[in-house]
Each structure stands twice: as structure tokens, then as C-alpha cells.
Design a protein with these regions (language model features):
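Structural recognition of the beta-strand scaffold that forms the well-ordered cores
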Residues: 16-17, 46-48, 75-76, 99-102, ...
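Catalytic nucleophile loop
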Residues: 101-104, 123-147
């Protein structure tokens, strides 16, 4: 009896992890890549804007952009409570989509509302079968299994300068931070990998994206750089540092990768670089179509989540009015 061939396992879809404030008016390199990966003229995009405080404004802007860039269909949803994310309609929308786009805003809101629901599971299962998933700013942080919940900026890693929680689980083994250079987040990413040395730290600048394929190779596109922190040979005193004191971090390998460079996340190795992508005349001409209202909205979207140190400040004010003691979190 002849042996029957096993059906080929579906390949996971690509992830487009954007550091926020991606170019929406001129080159639009990152958004163009997303549409291409999603199917170009056959792309069917689902926008999930749960993270954003701007609601329909942010959704409508991205819908307009994706249609301008050639997507065949764009639909959206904004579940604000877990019951909405658990609705059958949420999972059905994923089945009809070729790609999902997670907007920026507050990643803790996104993960708290969507994580572990029908919608969250449908995104993860769809990605395993080839669904392309992109996230910008807060949407980028939420894509990993481990997520930066909130924290303070600064170059020096300190105890308790940030907190980590569960993300959506699309990319295991990493923790992702965004607006990386612009909001000076190197210190908190160092603190995170010092506390969790099994994870790679990935920091993505604004208007920059890490495109991760099914093979686990990350490609950098856009204007800035992607910083990768590998703590495999880490030495630290993080387990001894008290409260908000600086912690010692040594032996972390730092990779700073501009556009065109690639990194193998599984082997933790740099790969041969690619040629950076140039803008087309069509992309450059698009800037003339932008209205001043659109420009203002783009600035507001880029600023979402900028003040994520509020929980930290509140905790410090409370600690000044109480006797010193070891706090638990």
C-alpha cells in the first residue's frame, strides 16, 4: 500500500512590529510593506483600535490610508470590554481577513480586553495559519508573549522602573518596547532583560518596523533602528537591588540595526543585510493630499501613550507619605 503524503503544515504569517509614529504622509514605507504582505490589491484588513483613546478618529485615518494604498477591503472593530471581544462576530471577522492591524494607545488596555478572548485566540490561531498581523506603538508591545505594561524612561536601568505583563502571544521569547530612542527607553529594557534573561529585548524606534517571518528572521525597515538586547551572558545584581535603585547589568550583547539589516531571533545571530527600500514617486506624491486636520490627528496618534509613567509617579507620592518598607507588586 502506497504511503500517503502528509499535508504541508501552514506557515505562520508575517509580523510587522512598528515602533509608533510611522510615516503616513510621505514615503509610507512601513504601511506599504504591510499592505503588500497582506495581499496587495486582494488585501482584506481588520483594524482593532481597542488600545486607542481616539476611537473612531484613529480607526478612520488608518482605514483611509489602507484604502489609498490599495487594500480591497477594510473593516474595523473596537471592543472595549471582554464581553465584546468574546462575541462570535469578533472571531468571524478574523476568518475573512488577510491581515490584522493593532493601533497604538494603551497596551495594557488592549491586552486586558482582548487577551484570552475569542478575538485574541482567533488572531493567534489565524497568524499560525498565515494571517499577517501588524501593530504600532502599544499594538507592537502587545504582540509578544511578554509585554511592557508601563514604566519610566531613562538611560539607567533601575529596580521597578517598569512592569511586565502577559501580551497576546504572537511572538514568544521576546519583550518589545516602542518609541525607543525618542522616549529614552534603553534603561527599562535593560532592566527587563536583567530580570528575565531568557527573553530577548527588542526596542523599536519611531517610523521603524521589525518584520518577522515564519523562520524567525527579523528584518528592519523604516527611518530609525531596532535595538536588540541579548542577555545570554548576563551578570546582574537585580535580585539584590532595593526599591528604585540603579541595578548592575553587564555582559548584555547590544545590536543596533538600521534599515536593511536582519537578525535571526532563534539563533540570536546577525544575518546578511538587505538593500534599504526607496520610496516610489507615487508614495512621495501622497503628501500633497494630506489636509491640516489629518496632520493634527497624526500628531495626536503619535503622542498616545507618551505619559506612561503616571503609575510610577503615584506610587512614589504614596511612598513618601508612608514608612519605608518592601512593597509587593
Amino acid at each position: 500500500m502506497a504511503a500517503t503524503a502528509r499535508p504541508a503544515r501552514p506557515r505562520a504569517g508575517q509580523l510587522v512590529i512598528i515602533g509608533g509614529a510611522e510615516d503616513k504622509l510621505r514615503h509610507r514605507t512601513i504601511l506599504n510593506r504591510f499592505i503588500t504582505l497582506a495581499g496587495g490589491p486582494e488585501a482584506r484588513i481588520l483594524i482593532v483600535s481597542t488600545a486607542s483613546s481616539l476611537g473612531e478618529e484613529a480607526t478612520d485615518l488608518y482605514a483611509q490610508l489602507f484604502r489609498q494604498l490599495g487594500a480591497a477591503e477594510v473593516v474595523s472593530m473596537r471592543p472595549l470590554i471582554r464581553e465584546e471581544a468574546n462575541s462570535p462576530r469578533a472571531a468571524e471577522l478574523i476568518k475573512d481577513a488577510t491581515a490584522v492591524f493593532l493601533t497604538g494607545g494603551n497596551q495594557l488596555r488592549l491586552a486586558s480586553v482582548v487577551g484570552g478572548t475569542r478575538l485574541g485566540r482567533a488572531v493567534v490561531d489565524g497568524h499560525r495559519r498565515g494571517l499577517v498581523v501588524a501593530g504600532t506603538s502599544a499594538g507592537a508591545s502587545a504582540m509578544a508573549s511578554h509585554m511592557v505594561a508601563f514604566g519610566a524612561g531613562g538611560a539607567t536601568p533601575k529596580q521597578r522602573m517598569t512592569q511586565m505583563s502577559a501580551g497576546l502571544g504572537l511572538l514568544p521569547g521576546v519583550v518589545i518596547d516602542q518609541h525607543f530612542e525618542q522616549r529614552n527607553r534603553i534603561g527599562r529594557l535593560l532592566a527587563l532583560v536583567a530580570l528575565s534573561p531568557g527573553l530577548l529585548g527588542i526596542g523599536i524606534d519611531e517610523d521603524t518596523a521589525a518584520v518577522v517571518g515564519h523562520s524567525g528572521v527579523l528584518e528592519v525597515i523604516g527611518k530609525g533602528s531596532v535595538t536588540i538586547l541579548d542577555p545570554a551572558k548576563l551578570q546582574t545584581d537585580a535580585y539584590e537591588a532595593k526599591r528604585y535603585r540603579p541595578i548592575m547589568v553587564s555582559g548584555v550583547i547590544l545590536h543596533s540595526l538600521p534599515s536593511g539589516y536582519r537578525f535571526d531571533l532563534r539563533r540570536r545571530q546577525l544575518r546578511a543585510n538587505l538593500r534599504p527600500v526607496d520610496a516610489t514617486d507615487r508614495e512621495l506624491a501622497a503628501v500633497n493630499a494630506a489636509t491640516e486636520r489629518t496632520r493634527r490627528l497624526i500628531r495626536r496618534i503619535a503622542a498616545e501613550g507618551a505619559d506612561d509613567t503616571a503609575p510610577e509617579r503615584a506610587r512614589r507620592r504614596a511612598s513618601r507619605s508612608q514608612p519605608l518598607e518592601e512593597a509587593s507588586e
